[in-house]
């Protein structure tokens, strides 16, 4: 089972990963070069 430190690290990593994924998706969808 996870302790608080592992859970906090995982939540932080997941949040950063989703943030980068959303930014990358926005750039790909907004840029007409990628089709």
Swiss-Prot record:
Protein known as: Dolichyl-diphosphooligosaccharide--protein glycosyltransferase subunit 4C
Intrachain S-S bonds: none
Chief subcellular location: endoplasmic reticulum
Segments in the Cytoplasmic topological domain: 30-35
Pfam families with a match to the protein in the record: Ost4
SUBUNIT field: Component of the oligosaccharyltransferase (OST) complex.
Role this protein plays: Subunit of the oligosaccharyl transferase (OST) complex that catalyzes the initial transfer of a defined glycan (Glc(3)Man(9)GlcNAc(2) in eukaryotes) from the lipid carrier dolichol-pyrophosphate to an asparagine residue within an Asn-X-Ser/Thr consensus motif in nascent polypeptide chains, the first step in protein N-glycosylation. N-glycosylation occurs cotranslationally and the complex associates with the Sec61 complex at the channel-forming translocon complex that mediates protein translocation across the endoplasmic reticulum (ER). All subunits are required for a maximal enzyme activity.
UniProt topology in membrane: Single-pass type III membrane protein
Family stated for the protein in its record: Belongs to the OST4 family.
Keyword Endoplasmic reticulum: yes
Transmembrane regions: 9-29
Any single GO CC term annotated in Swiss-Prot or TrEMBL for this entry: endoplasmic reticulum membrane
């Amino acid at each position: 089972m996870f302790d608080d430190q592992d859970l906090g690290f995982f939540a932080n990593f997941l949040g950063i990963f989703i943030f980068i994924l959303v930014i990358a998706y926005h750039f790909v969808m907004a840029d007409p070069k990628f089709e």
